[in-house]
A protein has these predicted regions:
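Short hydrophobic/aromatic patch on the recognition helix
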Residues: 257-258, 262, 307-308, 312
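Conserved hydrophobic/aromatic pocket- or pore-lining residues that grip, position, or stack substrates
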Residues: 193, 234, 258
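Alpha-helical bundle regulatory/interaction domains
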Residues: 1-5, 87-90, 94-222, 227, ...
Length: 327
């Protein structure tokens, strides 16, 4: 099942989706028919330039959403919050898929509509994600920051082209669950949703405001394609530290540009990002695999287990042994 659209200020996902699949739409609520699966899609209009789309369903077929880049310039931004337990495949420009879920460093995506993307939702898997659509001018007014850093300045500037990723903390996950559970029959439901969405945006932009205050490069489809190729290379063997000269040569980008765009997009240097992913995998293996601390350390390429223990404690606040024994 494929749903394809071209990004624009006028595009309304829930209306076009209901027409394409012949599903009735009532009060901006679309119930997934039993023939397709179960769940719903809900739109909440929070203002002329501010809206929310809630996706919560389990489908019988793989579901692919293809977003084509906007034909005309627009200052509409899309902010995706992936609250899935299971990773989703996100593809830019037909490159290899990148895994996204609430548990990784890229669970939140902030992007302009001039970038194409393909998201694949696997069949028989619970899908939960929220999309906030807002114009840069409306967002600038909401944030009300007198002296924004370069990241916030770029995001709230009309005509900019960018893609940013952020991790999702427990607070954000709880807010998303609260939003999905709001009773929309309540007279003040829209107001409550707006309060919660603003809280959601506060946590996101508070983190983005703490990023290094350096000049931001415009990001284009070809750049996004190369950055995801680099990310995939890093994730393909997290027991092997990334070597920037080789990465730059592989994707055909200068080392300087690669380092700057990667840090700009993912919020950290290539090596630090690699270490975060490495520690996330260590935490998962310690809890789920039944491996011993030494087995996890060696599996992730650590020859010195003391170094592994110190690094893990730096990220998680406890030693691997203590972490593996806690519930």
């Amino acid at each position: 099942m494929i749903f394809e659209f071209t990004a624009s200020l006028q595009f309304d996902f829930i209306t076009d989706f209901s027409k394409k699949y012949g599903i009735s739409l009532r009060n901006n609520y679309l119930a997934i028919p039993a023939s397709m699966g179960e769940g719903f899609v809900r739109k909440v209009q929070l203002g002329n330039d501010f809206r929310l789309m809630i996706h919560h369903y389990k489908l019988k077929e793989d579901f692919i959403i293809k977003r084509n880049p906007a034909v005309e310039p627009s200052d509409l931004l899309s902010i995706f919050f992936y609250n899935n337990e299971q990773p989703l495949d996100l593809v830019y420009n037909q490159e290899k898929p990148v895994k996204f879920s609430q548990k990784n460093e890229s669970a939140i995506q902030v992007t302009t509509n001039d970038l194409s993307s393909v998201i694949r939702f696997p069949a028989h898997t619970e899908t939960q994600y929220v999309v906030v659509g807002v114009t840069s001018s409306e967002l600038r007014s909401m944030l009300g920051v007198d002296k924004p850093n370069q990241v916030l300045k770029t995001i709230t500037t009309t005509g900019a082209s960018f893609l940013y990723f952020e991790s999702m903390n427990t607070e954000t996950q709880q807010i998303l669950k609260h939003i999905a559970a709001i009773n929309m029959n309540d007279d003040l439901s829209n107001f409550l949703v707006q309060v919660k969405v603003q809280e959601l945006l506060y946590h996101l932009f508070h983190k983005l405001s703490k990023r290094e205050n350096i000049s931001q490069r415009a990001l284009y489809n070809v750049d996004a394609e190369k950055l995801f190729e680099v990310r995939n290379i890093i994730l393909s063997d997290i027991g092997e530290p990334p070597y920037i000269p080789t990465l730059a040569t592989t994707v055909g980008m200068s080392e300087t540009k690669l380092k700057q765009l990667f840090k700009q997009t993912f919020g950290d240097t290539i090596y630090n990002y690699y270490q975060k992913i490495r520690m996330e995998e260590a935490a998962f293996l310690l809890k789920q695999s039944g491996y011993s601390v030494s087995e996890v350390g060696y599996h992730l390429g650590f020859s010195n287990l003391s170094h592994f223990s110190r690094l893990f404690q730096k990220h998680y606040g406890s030693t691997p042994k203590k972490y593996s024994s806690t519930e």
